[in-house]
Amino acid sequence: MSHQSELIAQDINAYLAQHEKKELLRFLTCGSVDDGKSTLIGRLLHDSKMIYEDQLEAVRADSSKHGTTGEKIDLALLVDGLQAEREQGITIDVAYRYFSTSKRKFIIADTPGHEQYTRNMATGASTCDLAIILIDARHGVMTQTRRHSYIASLLGIKHIVVAINKMDLLDFNESVFENIKADYLAFAAKLGMKDVMFVPISALDGDNVVNRSEKSAWYKGQTLMEILETVPIAGDKNYTDFRFPVQYVNRPNLDFRGFCGNVASGVVKVGDEVRVLPSGKTSHVKSIVTYDANLDEAFTGQAVTLTLTDEVDISRGDMLVLARDQVPQSNHVRAHLVWMTEKFMQPGSEYLFKFASKLVSGQIESIGYRVDVNTQEHSQVTHLQLNDIALVDVLLTQSVVADKYQQNRATGAFIVVDRLTNITVGAGMVVEQLQAEQTTPVNYSEFELELNALVRKHFPHWGAADLRKLLK
């Protein structure tokens, strides 16, 4: 099936060992309706030989029923899995796909191109390292292009690849390519985008996707796959500011007490002095435990269990940082907020806010402005509705560690949860911490407390927070 099918057949252990060491790149594709996002992903999977024969046969059969490419096989059907999407020829949900080459592993997020699915795109973009912005060569930079680029920039994606698609319909005209490139760069400069690359492609025929095209001799740059395999992403991670949100306290016996979680950013070593937030107590790292073996140090992204030299009171939601670092905490932050539910958001409404592993109650205090995702213009509004993006001030009942999102995506992001239904209603990216304010405790009605108890009793899989504990 793949480039390593022979190695898999001969020595599966060697293949797995080699595969484990590969770097992982997460990227998303976004563009206007019919720009060819799903076709491009299908082409990447097909030309990198990551499609099973039975999958290919199924797509050939479906092409005659749902296909949009005439006699040619419709590779978009490899990705458009939902029946509603196939019948409409569009992408609604975020479709994730996995593939690998000899150099890297990839996770693709195929995101919706329509404005009414802005929340879906924001979800797909939140964990990505790179974005492929598709532009139809016949139409150039459009309103949707600006919207997707703005969202990618807002979500902290540092690498942008502009794939100018359907160049085959214009005979790979170099002047068309250069004009679109100039238009996009003028817009990208306003968003502060620095690493922007351009590739002329035909997703339908495969030109410059995986294999270099003979139709564009004037193009001397890399193919799309070469860019994906070589773009440097290791430097994008924050290895400076150690942040360790405690997810679980592990006590298998009386002699062991470890704190489990993912290293959100930075590096920690055995012997390092750490501070527990919010209590401020300090201790030293005694050991770094993993399933395979103990480590001398742990890096960003690793799931580990830390043990400390002292008996310190630590629970889920606490944050471990290096004692020498000055890490500010506040209960008042300014953030960009993506609203994700049909129920309007009115300033002053009470919600639960989840920062890393810490759940705290609070309110969206005020709306600074709403951003028009198509024009990036600001407007004053009294409430937010589905798919709105706005600058807001958030006031919490407790102080949290909230880094700037552009500096630390792991601890600069939060979600907003409806306190009764436990539904995620918004996602936020911290712009700055504001001066802490005194807050009055949230007063839940007896009905709200009883309803919350019933939800937790009969629907434990929803993971609803215990409101009574939040009042303590």
UniProtKB/Swiss-Prot annotation:
Record's catalysed reaction(s): sulfate + ATP + H(+) = adenosine 5'-phosphosulfate + diphosphate
Region (G5): 202-204
UniProt GO molecular function: ATP binding; GTP binding; GTPase activity; guanosine tetraphosphate binding; sulfate adenylyltransferase (ATP) activity
CDD domains according to UniProt: CysN_ATPS, CysN_NodQ_II, CysN_NoDQ_III
First and last residue of the signal peptide: none
Region (G2): 89-93
Stretches the record annotates as G4: 165-168
One Pfam match: GTP_EFTU_D2
Region (G3): 110-113
Annotated PROSITE patterns: G_TR_1, G_TR_2
EC number of the protein: 2.7.7.4
The keyword Nucleotide-binding is assigned to this record: yes
Class of the enzyme per the UniProt entry, highest EC level: transferase
tr-type G domain boundaries: 22-239
Keywords linked to the UniProt accession: ATP-binding, GTP-binding, Nucleotide-binding, Nucleotidyltransferase, Transferase
Family (UniProt): Belongs to the TRAFAC class translation factor GTPase superfamily. Classic translation factor GTPase family. CysN/NodQ subfamily.
Its job: With CysD forms the ATP sulfurylase (ATPS) that catalyzes the adenylation of sulfate producing adenosine 5'-phosphosulfate (APS) and diphosphate, the first enzymatic step in sulfur assimilation pathway. APS synthesis involves the formation of a high-energy phosphoric-sulfuric acid anhydride bond driven by GTP hydrolysis by CysN coupled to ATP hydrolysis by CysD.
Protein name in the entry: Sulfate adenylyltransferase subunit 1
Species this protein is from: Cellvibrio japonicus (strain Ueda107) (Pseudomonas fluorescens subsp. cellulosa)
Name of the encoding gene: cysN
